[in-house]
A protein has these predicted regions:
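Small/polar-rich, solvent-exposed N-terminal microdomains that initiate assembly or binding
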Residues: 1-62
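Short, charged interaction patches at domain edges and termini
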Residues: 1-12, 52-67, 103-145
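Hydrophobic alpha-helical membrane-association signature
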Residues: 2, 87-91
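Active-site-adjacent structural patch at catalytic or cofactor/ligand-binding sites
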Residues: 67-75
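A generic structural motif
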Residues: 76-83
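Hydrophobic alpha-helical segments that drive targeting, anchoring, or assembly
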Residues: 84-85, 94
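A common structural junction motif
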Residues: 92-102
């Protein structure tokens, strides 16, 4: 069930990795999936999608409310302010006010929970800018499910 939530959201942003956008999309949401190195990355811009508020240690909702509210963190990275802004524009058009498809669940459109302007990461030796958009995901059992 939780994998379906993660997969439903990722299905909205993974097409950004294909042409013409060609922006790599990474996630460490389940099973310790790989994240990109933050230094020396071969691509000039990329995004990392993570989740919070979902029980991610297994597939079941046992012990959790049938109504799920989670947060989707989309971290944008680029070598310039403009690249990060471009990445935010692309991911926002893919996620904002869109309903992920999750089998057996009634899903509300994704809402912007908070947003951050691109800013330089001063801890990195190479130029790196970053910004985080946070979306709220709310699902409930589908009627008749």
């Amino acid at each position: 069930m939780i994998r379906a939530h993660v997969a439903g959201v990722l299905a909205l942003v993974t097409p950004l990795a294909a042409a013409p956008t060609s922006m790599p999309v990474y996630s460490s949401a389940l099973d310790g999936a790989e994240q990109p190195p933050l230094t020396g990355h071969p691509d000039s811009r990329w995004v990392v999608v993570d989740f919070d508020g979902l029980p991610q240690d297994n597939d079941r909702l046992a012990g959790w409310s049938a109504n799920i509210t989670g947060l989707v963190y989309v971290r944008h990275f680029g070598q310039t302010f403009a690249e990060v802004g471009w990445a935010q524009e692309k991911t926002r058009s893919a996620l904002l006010d869109v309903r992920p498809v999750i089998a057996g669940r009634s899903v509300q459109p994704l809402r912007m929970y908070s947003a951050q302007r691109p800013s330089p990461d001063r801890d990195e030796p190479t130029p790196l800018f970053a910004a985080v958009d946070v979306y709220q995901l709310f699902t409930a059992p589908a009627v008749g499910a």
